[in-house]
Amino acid sequence: MATASAPSPIYPLYRERWDFSVTMVTVVFAVYVVGLLGALLTLGPVSDRLGRRPVLLAALLLAAASTAIFWTAGGVLSLVIARTVQGVATGTAIGGLAAGLVDFSSARRPHAGTTVTAVGTSVGLAAGAAVVGLLVQSVAHPDTYVFSALTCVFLLLAVAVWYMPETVAPPAGEPIRLRPRVRIPYGSRHRFLAAVPALVAGWSVTGLFLALTPSVVAGVLHVTWGAAGGLDIAALFLAGGVGGMWSARHTVRRATLLGAVLLTLGSAGLAVAIALPSPVVYACGAVVAGAGVGLTYNGNLRAIGEVTTARSRSEVFSAVYVVSYAALSLPALAAGLLAPAWGLRTTSFLYVAFVGSLSLLALVHTARSRTGGPTGRDAGSPRGADALTACAGRSGQAGPAVAHRSPPNGDGSPPRIG
């Protein structure tokens, strides 16, 4: 995941070097997501059929190829190709990697895999942005140092995966289908649909930071220090990692509710920072919003992981990432297309207002759901989940969760995890 955020702090340098617009920056960012979603739709469930190890090995070799293209890039076309290959590599790996971490979780700590997935994603993205941001300020050609090192790292990781034990026994005689589809098993559907509003809100603010924050910091907040954009991105993701670990101490409902509140407050802070403008307020907004992303994301991954089986796990996690990365890319691409006409300041302000609206939607959705069990699952009859699924089938959107109260612990307090 460090590789996904590594190009972001370098985008302003690429713009100076090859003279392209903010719109092209978001296009370069968007093709990464196109490649990622294409791989998720076709290759995401393959690790359930072939096993985790061969899929991860292929993904690491593709990732090494993408960083090698970045390393030797000579123009915008090279960036587009490298970012697309990088997206395919990430999409190939990410469903199987999340499922594999759940496979390795012990019976005593069943949420360890999903916690590692959520926190590891945040820490990796933070590390990539922070290190590259500091290199932008320190050396003349940071891309040469970054992508040559990452190419070597991916090759070493491929060697390590070669010796990794396999966790899935591939079913004999079952054909591998690469049809682009996402299927959510019935038993996982109600939890998946309940997670959608928070996933969309969190990943939309992530898209703002990965695609536009270095340009916003320089062009709207008027910060000339080259590392500032990368450090703001790192602040968002480090806070997300802390929020992810914090969410393990709460029920899913409580974690998601608190996360939605923080996302709303963080979005408001970002809007104020852009209006003033204030780099300090922007950084504070990044921290608050990042904590909200971590809380909601980890809580929902935890809940979804509990209602999947080993055979369907990577397929379900692939669907989670399809929703997440669509939210990551589409608003950012729209902002890039609108920026030349409306200006970067107005566009970024409207962007964070959009994120704040989504956060409020997630907050209302979670507040109306009174699921208090260890995973936030309805403790009454399964009719609540059936109603949610039926509502989604009629309208094409996730309906509100049906209110049920789960029994409290012996001391009268709601059940907790951790």
What are these regions (language model features)?
Residues 37-74:
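Conserved MFS/SLC helix-loop-helix module at the cytosolic interface between two early adjacent transmembrane helices
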Residues 255-298:
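C-terminal transmembrane helical hairpin of 12-TM major facilitator-type secondary transporters
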Residues 303-344:
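A late C-terminal transmembrane helix in Major Facilitator Superfamily
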Residues 19, 51, 72-77, 273-277:
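Helix-breaking motifs and short loop linkers at transmembrane-helix boundaries and internal kinks
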Residues 84-120:
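Cytoplasmic helix-loop-helix junction between adjacent transmembrane helices
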Residues 77-86, 280-288:
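Paired small-residue
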Residues 112, 116-162:
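Helix-loop-helix hairpin linking two adjacent transmembrane segments in secondary transporters
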Residues 145-160, 348-364:
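Symmetry-related core transmembrane helices of the 12-TM Major Facilitator Superfamily/SLC fold
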